[in-house]
UniProtKB/Swiss-Prot annotation:
Main location: secreted
Spans annotated as Disordered: 816-899
Cysteines joined through disulfide linkages: none
Compositionally biased residues, Low complexity: 888-899
Highest taxon listed in the record's lineage: Archaea
GO CC annotation: extracellular region; plasma membrane; S-layer
Protein name as it appears in the record: Cell surface glycoprotein 2
Chain positions of motif PGF sorting signal: 899-901
GO biological process, one term: cell wall organization
Organism lineage: Archaea, Methanobacteriati, Methanobacteriota, Stenosarchaea group, Halobacteria
Amino acid sequence: MTGNSDKVRSLFLTALMVFSVFAGTIAFSGGAAAAANVSVQQAAEYDSGTVELALNGSTGSPVTTGDINIYIDGNENPSNYGVSSVDTTDDGTTGRLQFSLDQDVQPNRNLTVEVSGLTGGDNTVVAEDIDVTSQTIDADDDSGDTNAFRGEVLAIRADGGEGDADDATSSTQIVVEDSNGAVVTQDTYTANSKVYTYETENLDTGEEYEVTVGGTADENITISNLDLNVNIDDDVGDGANIDDTDTLAVNVSTTRGGEPANATLFNEDDDKVATQIKSLKGNENVVFDFGNQSADDSPYYVKVTDNQTGVSAESDQINVSESGEGDASFETSTVQDEVGDVTNITVQMGNTENAVINVGSQNDDNYVIQGQLEDDNGDGEVTVQFNSYTAGTDNNNTVLTVPGDDDLDEVEEKGSFTDSRNSLDEDVLEPQSYSINVTAGTSPDVTSPDTVGTLRLNENSVESMQTWVAPSDADIDDEDIDIYDRIGENLTQSDDVAVEDVVVHEIQASGIEGALEYEQEDNGSSDVTDAFIAAADTTPDRINDDTSASGLQLYVNRTDVGANADADPINFANSSSAVTVVDDPDNNTYFVALDTEDVEFESGNTITEEEDTEINATFSVQEGPLTDDSSSESELYTTSERNAELNLDDDGFVTVGAAAGQTVSGDTNVAPGSELEVEMESESEANPFVERPEATVGPNGTYVATEDFSDYSAGTNFTVQTLDVDGDSDFSDEEDGRIVEADTATVSISDQESDGSEVVVDSAQLSSGGFIAIHAGDASGDVVGNSEYLEAGTYNDLTITLDEPMDENFTAVAMPHQDTNGNEEYDFPGDDGPYTQNGSAVTDSANVTVSAEEPEDTPEDTPEDTPEDTPEDTPEDTPADTPEDTPDTGTETTEAEGPGFTAAIALIALVAAALLAVRRDN
């Protein structure tokens, strides 16, 4: 008996067979629709508006222009696309129909042809989605090379190998080979066709290919890359994951410009949503903006087609979701700063790009400023900068700003404070708490803000000043080096400054950031240095009474001017090349650097090496717009002549050994971090030489130069002097030097156990005294301990206490060091370099096993108790109990595996049931 479902299935199959019989008269995409026994085997548009239909038989009678209808993108017989003529030979009766259009069809268009008036049966044939080619290659014209972009569809017109295109048959072969002769395509022409459509998508860019038709005619095709790119860009739209209030847009670029391109937006069902046509620009982005799109049809993608070549590219998927209710909040509900500073207020946004912020309250504070924020970069937050120094002035664009990619519009100040403050000379906002609020959206009328917070403006003050020194060639404002990273390298705290070095005044003061910001953004200062000098009064009133509006003052005065004379201040206008300011407003810190070589005082005098100069630097915020109470800090320092002094031995010589790694040291007052040279020159006939090793000044003013004297003989004399940063030889006195037999040392250390607090060196010999240092790991490892000063001589079983106990095994490297500065204190690194032999440090190494001390009573307890208990109890219990318990244990183990076994049986049962059900159905 046939079931109902089988009956339905039979009816469906019967209907499908009947439908397939009639389907022969219905159009087929890209190919054939039948009219009687005639169908289209291939269709192509080529050669600027020529259309070929290759039929499987004759149309019976010639096709005329009136028998042909043209559809472009679904539009019937559009203007400019009329059929101008039908080929007199290939009029359909030969099985080939060729006709010409009034206008070339671009490769990006959809072309459909309907031919009627055929004899016999249904008299209409339709060819849909015809291949529209961008270039035509005539294989018999020997035209040479054809340049094509990868992805173009080409038409290759045949000649059958006999020089006459009419001779092409279905056996005519077309072969495409690469430059190495490898065949990439081998095919034949369709019956009744003289045109072969060839897609270049799979060819390699930069390659040349040879086309052979019928075995004789050749044509070369060179493939280039159009480099058509469709990118989802946050700069022009809102990205790949957006909501229905965001902008859907793409950036399109190509290597060739000037040609139009068609951009089509498709939804998740591949339905066309919108189309735009724009001309592309070579290597420049062109934006296609499709505005807001519905979340219902998400995801979307954009397909862009170059109209001339037909080359296409698609964007990645763009997801559109429904927008939720927008909200805005503050990252921190309470923000604190000082009056006069620039305060950062970070606003966070959800489901919105816009928010309105209010700082202050017109009712409570008599001042409010409002602005509309836009999250242009789509990161969900906008940082607002509020300048309390300029608040209330006419130019409110300096009060509320937004840095970076985000945007700020519709800024407006209100309140009696704004009405009364007409210039920066008048008082700024009072130090107190101000309300702040933010609301999602763009409406300025805020009655119920999303979030309310507090801005606490405290009183400003000058906290401290101290001076640092830097080398004369230091580039203080180098953006690649953080000024704090210089500390300990080439920035050292000191009140003794060598002439030509840089003195850096570190000022810690709050409430001055806003004035500097105003000078840079609105008053023409090119950088923070210009802004600082413009904002601060640098000249006493007795010289110039043009005080600054901010009340900031920086006086740097020479004080050693003698009796009955005023201090001589630096003329900052004439010393502009000497001044550099580096600001750190987040920490209320400002570094004002002065190059002492270029400083000029109001008297016209400069800082010279002929005499010491005493200077008093004072920074203050005077009573005025920024504060009701003045505050200031000062620092005294002295400049002195640059000098260096070499360290000599007891005989008054700079003495080195005839070996590698010899050191020459000295002391100087120039800034630590300065790069000096020590010049050593011998005019000896036997051993003439000039050596100039470099030496870096250390934090304590010492410097050490290291040189190899192993090629020179003991007994050679030389002269030595220290050269300044600029190579100046007058920097130090010239001293006498001599080469003596090289100092020697030996050391021996063995593998050992230790509690980690000390190591024992077996033996050591130091020809000139010094120290034994212990390095961890290898010779370049950290020094973890050193001996006391050792006189010249030999030592055995030398115990060295480590700086910190070691808690695990390590390799100890023993290394003898010299006492190069003669102070009998270990000063390495810097001074006290190691003894060397053949250019390498003298060392020996050993493995140190760190072990804890074992408790004394543990070994005694273990043997007394355990042997006595075990034989008495265990043998009696084991035979009696264990045999009876073991079977139970085995049973329990089997049961423990039961659930897994049951699951396997259940699975088999299910399979069996399924097979039984199938059998019953059959």
